[in-house]
Amino acid sequence: MTTETIEATREGTLWREAPPYFDDLEIGDSMESSGRTVTEYDVVSFAALTGDWHPQHADAAWAKESPFGRRIAHGMLVLSYALGLLPIDPRVVLALRSIDGAVLKRPVGLGDTIRVRARLADKRVLGAETGLVTLAVRIVNQADELVARMEIVVLWRRQTEAAEAPPSGDELSPLQDGRLLA
């Protein structure tokens, strides 16, 4: 997916025009992704990577007799795609901190297309350079039916002199030694 395909809006403007820093964000801001169609290749690759060869995902004959009547994508694949579909800029979104309250509401089958809608639910300053942003994420299919929801917390860069200037030798950035100091 290219930047041009992202359809993320914030009060009528595209978030891709300039990355919003933490202090620019407001509770209630929202974004929506473009669509992503789940394919046979996606499901088989995910099964190979994770070792999850449950017949609901991998065996067409078995899945046909299941309550879903067809093969479906792994729930974790759907949630992973949702994270990847979020139109957020890596210059300001530094890390995923947590995934909370993930609920899978209906199956996503091969050939289904998912989209992500996210709303900024909360934010708090973590330090001079970063803050934590909570996004309420809803994943919908091509019929606009809710397939999953979750809340994610991400580490977001603040636009401050401390964030713009590299740390001096004696200062520790919250990310400098590879772990988040909070």
Label every PLM stretch briefly:
Residues 4, 109, 135-158:
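Short peripheral tails and domain-boundary helices/loops at the edges of structured domains
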Residues 20, 26-33, 113-115, 132-134, ...:
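Intrinsic-disorder/low-complexity, polar/charged segments enriched in Ser/Thr/Lys/Arg/Asp/Glu/Gln
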Residues 95, 101-106, 148, 152-156, ...:
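A structural preference for long, well-packed, hydrophobic secondary-structure segments
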Residues 22-25, 38, 72, 102, ...:
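Hydrophobic beta-strand core residues of beta-sandwich domains
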